[in-house]
Structure formats: C-alpha cells, structure tokens
Design a protein with these regions (language model features):
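Loop-to-transmembrane helix entry
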Residues: 1-14
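Helix-to-loop junctions at the C-terminal end of transmembrane segments
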Residues: 16-30, 114
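Structural signature of the two symmetry-related core transmembrane helices
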Residues: 32-47
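Helix-loop junctions at membrane interfaces in 12-TM secondary transporters
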Residues: 49-61
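Intracellular juxtamembrane helix-capping segments at the cytosolic ends
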Residues: 70-83
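A late C-terminal transmembrane helix in Major Facilitator Superfamily
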Residues: 88-115
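A membrane-interface helix-boundary motif in multi-pass transporters
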Residues: 112-129
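Multi-pass alpha-helical transporter architecture, strongest
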Residues: 125-144
Length: 144
C-alpha cells in the first residue's frame, strides 16, 4: 500500500513538473504562481491528516505534488530574477546553502516532534509553509 502511494505521488510530481509547469510558467509570472502554490502546499501537507483510509490519500497527494511542483522552481526563478546579474551565481549558491541547512533540521527535531504526537510533523511543517506563504503575500515588494 505504501509503495503504491509513493508511486502515485511520483507520477503526480512527474506530471506537474513534466507537463504542467512549463506552459503555466510561460503564461503566469512567478509571484502569482507562488501566491497560490505555497498556500496549496501548506494546506495539502496538513490535509494528509484528514483521510481515515489510505485510499482517500489518493485525493490529497496530487495537491501536495502540485503545490511543491510549482513552488520550488518558481521560488528559484524569483530569487534569480531579483538578484543583480553580477551576483546571480553567488545568490543562488547562498540559496542552495540555506536550502541544504533547512533540510538538515527536520531529521534533527523530527523525533522530538513525533514523540509529542504522531500527527505533529505534518502540522508543524504545514504551519511553517503557511507562515512562509503569509510572509510572502504580506511583503510589499510582491504585491500587485
């Protein structure tokens, strides 16, 4: 059952990044995409907790894939576009370093969070994504 769920998730990631991302990104700039995709991802991560049967996860997992699939490349595009051309490489390198550090933290604190409640990691991660979304949409330089 777990293998089928991960296969299904992988299929949706491939569809999102292989078929949907390019045409959508060609028509819509990164900021409006991020306004929607970050919100979708935060809600979808927490939405994983809602189904009481594994079969219902098949309805939620595409939302996670869509949120993640549109957020990551558009965040990178936004960072690249905001950087001065002479600093792009350095800024993208710093971004990668921060991203790597951010991926180090969940395994370090995950056990503690799971010990509090088995649902806590999804609630905490979804909350942080929603906090990032709120910070993003509140930033004056990204308002239309």
């Amino acid at each position: 059952d777990i293998g089928a769920l991960f296969g299904y998730l992988g299929l949706w990631i491939a569809l999102t990044q292989g078929l949907l991302l390019r045409p959508v990104s060609a028509r819509i700039p990164p900021v409006p995409i991020l306004r929607v995709s970050l919100l979708l991802m935060g809600l979808a991560v927490m939405g994983i907790l809602l189904p009481d049967r594994s079969v219902l996860l098949y309805a939620v997992l595409p939302l996670v894939s869509l949120g993640q699939g549109f957020s990551s490349p558009n965040l990178l595009s936004l960072i690249s576009n905001k950087a001065d051309s002479s600093m792009q490489g350095e800024i993208l390198g710093i971004n990668q370093s921060v991203n790597s550090f951010a991926q180090l933290l969940p395994p370090l604190i995950g056990g503690f969070i799971v010990a509090m409640d088995i649902r806590a990691p999804l609630l905490v991660s979804g909350s942080f994504i929603l906090l990032a979304w709120l910070t993003f949409v509140s930033n004056r330089s990204y308002r239309s």
